[in-house]
Regions:
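GST-like fold's C-terminal all-alpha helical module
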Residues: 151-261
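Short His-centered aromatic/hydrophobic patch
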Residues: 246-296
Length: 306
């Protein structure tokens, strides 16, 4: 979700090291809404840059953004308006109406796990898949667990709490957009809310079930944290990335690259539930993963492409 109006500026990039020693770009405006491609990036290079089609607040989108940023892969992000995004992603991928979708070498993929697999094959360093075959299988198993057993449930529980509050959801969905898209979504929100409740099967019973699944996923996370501090082996892998990205709405880390609903504006019951998870060892681990491994943004936004 991003179409920002802020003035674009050019930034000078230097190379430093992150907390785990990986080289990374340092950009004074790393979370700037609009970053132009730096001098020396021409039209031909822009044409072959990966393009991420995203909804900014989606946890599955955060999973792919994190992978791109962790590997320092220059890319362009195109944020879509919720509700209308399905038309674009289905046209791109031919088989899915969801985000994220990544266009790479002229082909688009619409599944976060397949996207990371393609990224890992194309840009293997720094690794997200362990070299050891057994550890690699374990990391992929945990990625699948959090994708399937956490992702849908945290989304359902979140929207159950927030959809009754258009004064919170509409600004969240349209942050940085011009007046016309904001007005469009505000007018269409009652219809969008009904559609989302139907699509994600959102009601009081399903939301209570999803809260329980979130607690179960936190239980599993805490059991899986090894003496090294990671889920698999002694380094950061796709398992850690997936768990942390999909739980970002619980951790609410300052490193998350887009604004969230202010904690004091959240419904009381949801805020208290989040706090109960944040205080757990797993909640502290999530914050640590963001502090240590949520690298600076590798997004490039060329003015001429907007």
């Amino acid at each position: 979700m991003k179409a920002h109006d802020a003035m674009r500026t050019k930034h000078t990039h230097t190379v430093t090291r992150d907390r785990v020693g990986h080289p990374r770009r340092v950009d004074p405006g790393r979370l700037s809404p609009d970053r132009e491609a730096p001098a020396g990036v021409g039209d031909r290079e822009l044409l072959v840059l990966p393009v991420l089609w995203q909804l900014e607040i989606s946890h599955y989108n955060e999973k792919v953004r994190w992978a791109l940023d962790y590997k320092h892969i220059p890319h362009i992000r195109r944020s879509l308006l919720p509700g209308l995004h399905a038309v674009k992603t289905r046209r791109l991928t031919g088989d899915t109406s969801t985000t994220p979708a990544l266009t790479l070498d002229g082909r688009s993929n619409g599944d976060s796990t397949r996207i990371i697999a393609a990224i890992e094959e194309r840009w293997p360093q720094p690794r997200l898949y362990p070299e050891d075959p057994a550890q690699r299988r374990r990391a992929l198993e945990l990625e699948d667990f959090f994708d399937e057993e956490l992702g849908p449930h945290i989304r359902r529980a979140f929207y159950y709490e927030l959809l009754p509050h258009p004064e919170l959801v509409v600004p969240l969905f349209t942050q940085g957009r011009r007046r016309a898209p904001r007005a469009l979504l505000r007018a269409a929100f009652p219809v969008l809310r009904v559609a989302m409740r139907q699509r994600f099967e959102i009601d009081a019973d399903s939301a209570a079930h999803s809260r329980a699944k979130m607690v179960a996923a936190m239980d599993r996370l805490e059991r899986e944290i090894s003496a090294s501090g990671y889920l698999v082996g002694d380094s950061f892998t796709v398992a850690d990335l997936t768990a942390a990205a999909l739980f970002y709405g619980v951790a609410r880390p300052p490193e998350f690259p887009y604004p969230m609903v202010a904690v004091n504006d959240l419904p009381d019951s949801w805020r208290e539930f989040l706090h109960s998870l944040q205080r757990r060892p797993g909640g502290q681990w999530l914050a640590q993963m963001y502090r240590q491994h949520r690298c600076q943004s590798a997004e490039l936004t060329p003015a001429r492409a907007r």
